[in-house]
């Protein structure tokens, strides 16, 4: 399905390469035959004959053709005419190609097709007419293609569809009408398409859907109505689609969803209502969606969530509610969502979360609460979320982490707390997070870390503490982090690291100490990258060990790193890692690595 389950252009390209086999002919003799005794290839085209399938493909793509080439072999199975300048297709243009089952006319500046243009194509299976300039199609255009299974009319200028346009296409499986200018569709335009599985109507100007429109599409599996101008979802519109699995209603102007609008859609697995103007959800908005797995409601205007709103969605796995106007999460807001794995509530206006708000979310693995203004979280608010492995609380106005804020999160792997105003973290408030692998406290207001803050975090690998106000770290604060691999302490106010501060970090490979107030430092063995620039280094005897280490390990302490650059116009960006001396006066401004060895002879 276009833009949702795979690009038709990709299918076309793959088919092209499959068609190119050992019998591919091109170049020296444009009129060469497909094989020694086969039919002649048109002069302006290239032909490929597949011995295994006994199929002939004719490639006339992007040849600047203004009319169809002469001499297309009658045995042709696939004909590629895309990327030309054909303008129109005359009557009976393909009448001798009764074996044709694939015809590609996309991107050929077509403005019209004569009513009899497809005469003789009774075995045609795939027809690509997308990316042209078609404004209308004759009512009987497709009566000569009864075998058609896939029809793509996307990205044209169609403003209306004639009654009976698709009559007789009982085998049609995939119909793409997306990205046209359709405002209203006739009630019976899809009548007779009983085998249709995928219907794309995205990118049009539809303002409403009449219940009769989708009658007879009982086999439909996927319906894309995104990027239209729909203002509401009314009851009974989708009642005749019992097998529909995916419904896209995103990027419309929907302000309201009628009660029981999706009743009877037991097969629906994916419902996208994001990027609309929905202001509220009722308790009976989603009844009947017993098989729903994904519900997307992000980028709406929802201000509150009522208890039991999602009570019937027992098999829901993903619920997206980010970028709304939700102010509070009350008790049992998500009751009934026992199978939910992903919950996004980012970028709302949530200022209060009640204890019990997440009751029943036994299987949730990822929760995003970032971009709200929580200020504080009640203790035990996450109790019962033992399977949660990623918790996002970035940019949430948090000022303090209490002792039992994260109680119950025994399975948490990643905790993101960056860009808050955290100035206080209570001792052992992280002690229950024994499975934690990554902790991000970047860009807060921490001035010190409690001695036992990391007690119990023996699995932690990534610790990010940059852009705080740390002036010192006690020598045993990092002791429990024996598996730490990556430590970022940049952009703080650290002066003199305690002796042995990093000695217990035997697996440490990345250490960032740039932009602190360090004057001396003894490097840690085993490091693979060490950042030290923007410190007021005292380049006297205490720094000799660092000088020797930097000179012996230029890959660990590089003078600069060039950022990977992509694109023709991309300018390389260099990150410098200077060890600039602030003193003594005779070496001030020099890089430690450039100072003569003689200055350290008496050290």
Swiss-Prot record:
Kindly state which keywords UniProt assigns to this record, in alphabetical order: Cell adhesion, Disulfide bond, Glycoprotein, Leucine-rich repeat, Repeat, Secreted, Signal
> Which BP terms in the Gene Ontology apply to this protein?
cell adhesion
Q: Where is the LRRNT domain?
A: 32-74
Q: Name one Pfam family in it.
A: LRR_1
Protein's cellular compartments: Secreted, Extracellular space
Sugar-bearing residues? 64, 85, 96, 368, 515, 578, 586
LRRCT domain spans which residues? 535-603
Q: Which GO terms describe its cellular component?
A: insulin-like growth factor ternary complex
Kindly list any coiled-coil regions of this protein: none
Keyword Glycoprotein belongs to the record: yes
What is the predominant subcellular site recorded for this chain? secreted
Q: Where are the LRR repeats?
A: 75-96, 99-120, 123-144, 147-168, 171-192, 195-216, 219-240, 243-264, 267-288, 291-312, 315-336, 339-360, 363-384, 387-408, 411-432, 435-456, 459-480, 483-504, 507-528
Entry keyword Glycosyltransferase: no
User: So which residues are the signal peptide here?
Assistant: 1-23
Q: Which cysteines are joined by disulfide bonds?
A: 41-47, 45-60, 539-581, 541-603, 565-570
Q: Whom does it interact with, and what assembly results?
A: Forms a ternary complex with IGF1 and IGFBP3.
Q: What does this protein do?
A: May have an important role in regulating the access of circulating IGFs to the tissues.
Q: Which PANTHER family match?
A: LEUCINE RICH REPEAT FAMILY PROTEIN (PTHR45617), LEUCINE-RICH ALPHA-2-GLYCOPROTEIN (PTHR45617:SF101)
Name of the featured protein: Insulin-like growth factor-binding protein complex acid labile subunit
**Which source organism?**
Mus musculus (Mouse)
Q: What is the lineage of its organism?
A: Eukaryota, Metazoa, Chordata, Craniata, Vertebrata
Q: Which gene encodes it?
A: Igfals
